[in-house]
Amino acid sequence: MEDLLVVGQIINTHGLRGEMKVMPLTEDMRRFDYLEYVILKGQKIKVEGVKYFKDKVILKLQGINSIEEAEKLKRTYLEIEREDAIELEEDEYFIVDLVGCTVVDTEGFEYGKIKDVIQTPSNDVYWVQGKKEVLVPVLKDIVLDINMDEKLITIRPSGEWQYED
């Protein structure tokens, strides 16, 4: 498992005093209210202020006090230590932990490994890459078991839920 989790990306400056506009890469952008520190380019930096504007976070970090300093950080990802992450409910996982898991069905067929998780309004979808690319809807009647220790996800055979042309 990854020790650091990406929570946002600096996309622009905000004002003249070093504030930065951040695109949140987390389901609940209000989680920034609880961050004391972020990891920026490998360094742990104290969060001095958090504001919200539309669907973006305005972040003030210690030691970044001018627009020029903030400008240099555009396109940089913000990370947090796993121990500072929100607590997940049972059967919830961080996407970074699912990527690379092997997907097999109950008949032993191996589809490949999860390349990414696509978040849709109704349910997540595993993007599985193997001999063929397969999109697996993350629904209880399709995804039967997730074993994070073995990085193995078991699903129903695709013929039971996927229609082929």
UniProtKB/Swiss-Prot annotation:
Binds ribosomal protein uS19. InterPro entries: PRC-brl_dom, PRC_barrel-like_sf, RimM, RimM_N, RimM_N_sf, Transl_B-barrel_sf. Belongs to the RimM family. One of its GO terms (biological process) is rRNA processing. It comes from Clostridium perfringens (strain SM101 / Type A). The keyword Chaperone applies. An accessory protein needed during the final step in the assembly of 30S ribosomal subunit, possibly for assembly of the head region. Essential for efficient processing of 16S rRNA. May be needed both before and after RbfA during the maturation of 16S rRNA. It has affinity for free ribosomal 30S subunits but not for 70S ribosomes. It comes from the Bacteria. One of its GO terms (cellular component) is ribosome. It is found in: Cytoplasm. Keywords: Chaperone, Cytoplasm, Ribosome biogenesis, rRNA processing. GO terms for molecular function: ribosome binding. This is Ribosome maturation factor RimM. Residues 90-161 form the PRC barrel domain. Gene3D superfamilies: PRC-barrel domain, RimM. The PRC barrel domain binds ribosomal protein uS19.
